[in-house]
UniProtKB/Swiss-Prot annotation:
GO terms for cellular component: cytosol. NADP(+) binds at residues 165-167, 192, 233. It catalyses: (6R)-5,10-methylene-5,6,7,8-tetrahydrofolate + NADP(+) = (6R)-5,10-methenyltetrahydrofolate + NADPH; (6R)-5,10-methenyltetrahydrofolate + H2O = (6R)-10-formyltetrahydrofolate + H(+). One of its GO terms (molecular function) is methylenetetrahydrofolate dehydrogenase (NADP+) activity. GO terms for biological process: L-histidine biosynthetic process; methionine biosynthetic process; purine nucleotide biosynthetic process; tetrahydrofolate interconversion. Belongs to the tetrahydrofolate dehydrogenase/cyclohydrolase family. Keywords: Amino-acid biosynthesis, Histidine biosynthesis, Hydrolase, Methionine biosynthesis, Multifunctional enzyme, NADP, One-carbon metabolism, Oxidoreductase, Purine biosynthesis. This is Bifunctional protein FolD. The keyword rRNA-binding does not apply. Pathway: One-carbon metabolism; tetrahydrofolate interconversion. It holds the Pfam family THF_DHG_CYH.
Length: 281
């Protein structure tokens, strides 16, 4: 195992120290930032993610509000909870934990969120602002991934980046963010319709694996010294696995572990979105 470990936990702790000071300053002014989560159903992974988010709130000093709903909640009942959070002055920002059960209209739920309270940065208005390069809450996982690369000195300017996966939470927005002038990367977005994935990845300086297919990126698909971000998650035989095969560590120059790589920064930038909105209020 020769690759540098892109340890998200180390960087998360640095971000949390900064946020603690900012939250204390807000509290001195009588402002208490509040993060709410909306969780539908009993998926163990989703419950684990939400627990970690609320633990992070406790560490930083942000008020946490939790809305847990049964798996058979109706669309109308879920939208009513969204409306309540939109109107709640104690809720600075919130997220709806995805994915939702299949009987619920995910897009309609996301559209119902007040864009100003969209802590995940996934509301259509905020994604549109990302396209236009206007200020808005940024999607947390792509933002965390890019900051992780920066923190460890991985060069992006002019580099070829291959993104595997075209989902709305990672693949599509990270492609937009990497082509901003601040990153200035050349991005190839690969997906199930890509004819020769390995031919694309072998040319990449940086690979973002966000397909949700366990161990699909193998060493023979990676050029020597490339930086690899493992963002995808799959459940196999009761275990959570990333998209990157362990043999990639012997070829790559830097790899984010999964868990412990991008995930901690996803949560850190979620809280930062909430704190920044409180600072603007």
């Amino acid at each position: 195992m020769s690759a540098i470990k892109l340890d998200g936990n180390l960087y998360r702790d640095e971000i949390f120290e900064d946020l603690k000071g900012r939250v204390n300053s807000l509290r001195e002014k009588g402002i208490v930032p509040g993060l709410a989560t909306v969780l539908v159903g009993d998926d163990p992974a989703s419950h684990a993610y939400v627990r970690m988010k609320h633990k992070d709130c406790e560490i930083v000093g942000v008020k946490s509000i939790r809305k847990d709903l049964p798996a058979d909640v109706t669309q109308e009942e879920l939208l009513a909870v969204i409306d309540d959070l939109n109107a709640d002055p104690e809720c600075t920002g919130y997220i709806v934990q995805l994915p939702l059960p299949k009987h619920l209209d995910e897009n309609a739920v996301l559209e119902r969120i007040d864009p100003a309270k969209d802590a995940d940065g996934l509301h259509p208005v905020n994604l549109g602002k990302l396209v236009l390069n206007e200020p808005a809450p940024l999607p947390c996982t792509p933002n965390g991934a890019i900051h992780l690369l920066r923190r460890f000195g991985v060069e992006l300017d002019g580099k070829k980046v291959v993104v595997i996966g075209r989902g709305v939470t990672v693949g599509r927005p990270i492609g937009l963010m990497l082509t901003r002038r601040s990153e200035n990367s050349t991005v190839t977005l690969c997906h199930t319709g890509t004819r020769d994935l390995a031919a694309e990845t072998r040319e990449a300086d940086v690979i973002v694996a966000a397909a949700g297919k366990a161990h699909m990126l193998t060493a023979d698909m990676v050029k020597q010294g490339a930086a690899i971000l493992d963002v995808g998650v799959s459940r196999v035989d009761g275990k959570l696995l990333g998209d990157v095969h362990p043999d990639v560590w012997d070829v790559a120059g830097a790899v984010s572990p999964n868990p412990g790589g991008v995930g901690p920064l996803t949560r850190a930038f979620l809280i930062r979105n909430v704190v920044e909105r409180a600072e603007r209020a």
